Amino acid sequence: THSSPNKEHDGLHVARVAQTLNPETLKTELTEAGNESLALEGLARQQGFDTSQQHTAYHDAFTSLKILRIIKDKHKDNWENFLSTSTKNSVETILKSEGIYSIFENVKGKNMMYLVSTLHPDHCFHPSYASWGYLFDLRRDPEPLLNLSVNDLKVYLKKFSPKALRVIKTNKAPVVLDKKFALKEKAYADL
């Protein structure tokens, strides 16, 4: 969590985004399911780093720093954008802007990119969990949903697979990027 004006980010989120945008960013191992693994020890091994003292606080922090330096070097144009959502406020500002943007999630071990839009700037957060923002996945046309009653909408949305609503936790430093990235994905290419 974040307390203003402090900032923090999650290196794993940054690594997932970098690897999703360019699978050549880091050398990775594969999981048993055949997905790229971004486990720190495996990344260290694949980059040729010494892993003899892995799992000590100092060594893991230093390894993370070296991996993030590789990402920064290979993603110079996007590095500042990767870090721009390091506070809850910065993410909430984006969600309230009524824009269209790219978000990234790890779903069943696969890094996924989604083209999403805020539902409504005044009603885009969970009523009980204020840091949960709701976004609409634009692989579906939202137009037919606009005139449904709330109850019909709830029933209709539960039928979608993959799910039509994405949840973004604003206090977990998610990476939110320009829509141009997700528009390259097959699911959104015709928009």
Q: What do the PLM-derived regions correspond to, one by one?
A:
Residues 70-191:
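Acidic two-metal-ion nuclease catalytic site recognized across multiple nuclease folds
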Residues 1-76, 82-85:
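Metal-dependent phosphoesterase core characteristic of DEDDh/y 3'-5' exonuclease domains
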